[in-house]
Regions:
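Active-site catalytic motif of lipid deacylating hydrolases and related acyltransferases
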Residues: 1-56, 104-112, 193
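Active-site signature of alpha/beta-hydrolase-fold catalytic machinery across serine-
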Residues: 18, 72-76
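Short beta-strand/loop motif that positions the catalytic acidic residue
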Residues: 169-171, 175
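Conserved alpha/beta-hydrolase catalytic His-Asp/Glu region
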Residues: 113-160
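Flexible "cap/lid" loop of the alpha/beta hydrolase fold
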Residues: 78-112
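Gly/Ala-rich beta-loop-alpha elbow adjacent to hydrolase catalytic centers
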Residues: 61-70
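Catalytic histidine-centered segment of alpha/beta-hydrolase-like enzymes
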Residues: 38-39, 192-207
């Protein structure tokens, strides 16, 4: 069964290099496409989903923005499993200050290059292994600042209230982007941060193996 991976906002398929699938499941990494001006997240998800073969069962795995994107795709196509990691499936699990930021349109005040710079600074201070940190910083450097700014705006304007069927939600108790206290995950990683697929991938892989066992 094909398993489609969707990365976070300033990343690509390399972010999943530590994630392993059991026999019978094939990893396919969906690359981001260029958004249209002020395109809604729901419309973008429809266009991204054109890369998915929907004539056969498939699994979706998304991290951060990728988890939100995977949620939108799952709502339309109802795959056997939707797995989001360090993400949220509905607006009610976002912190209230996201809505304040959207109402004040704070995303308009800063250029995409500033978001990109802040992402780099954050990862200089995190606990990834040196090789992982090097790859992450390279991915951030290669990301179009305009895409980062679009992604932030799209998330702040997202309003989904429906929980998809077959949702599996992995979340760390120290997630600094989507605080744990607002979420309702199916699987919790104690003291896990937002970058679980890099900092706690051993535990993520164990959880994934348990989930995939139910799909065989």
């Amino acid at each position: 069964m094909k398993t489609y991976f969707i990365s976070g906002i300033a990343a690509d398929g390399r972010i999943f290099r530590h994630i392993h699938l059991p026999d019978g499941f094939e990893a396919v990494y969906l690359d981001w496409i260029k958004p249209q001006p002020e395109e809604a997240l729901e419309n973008y998800a429809d266009r991204l989903a054109k890369k998915i073969n929907k004539d056969e069962p498939f699994v979706l795995i998304g991290v951060s923005l990728g988890g939100i994107m995977a949620t939108e795709i799952a709502l339309k196509y109802n795959p056997p499993a939707l797995i989001i990691i360090g993400s949220v499936p509905v607006i009610s699990q976002m912190p209230g200050y996201f809505r304040i930021a959207e109402k004040l349109k704070l995303y308009k005040l800063f250029p995409g290059s500033l978001y990109k710079f802040s992402a780099k600074v954050k990862h200089y201070l995190t606990r990834e292994k040196p090789d992982d940190k090097k790859i992450i910083l390279k991915m951030i450097s290669e990301t179009d600042p305009a895409f980062i700014k679009w992604g932030i705006r799209a998330v702040l304007k997202w309003r989904n209230k429906r929980i998809p069927k077959s949702l599996y939600h992995i979340h760390g108790t120290r997630d600094e982007v989507f605080p744990y206290r607002f979420t309702s995950p199916t699987h919790t990683i104690i003291k896990g941060d937002h970058a679980l697929v890099n900092t706690r991938y051993e535990e993520v892989n164990i959880i994934l193996m348990d989930i995939f066992t139910t799909l065989k």
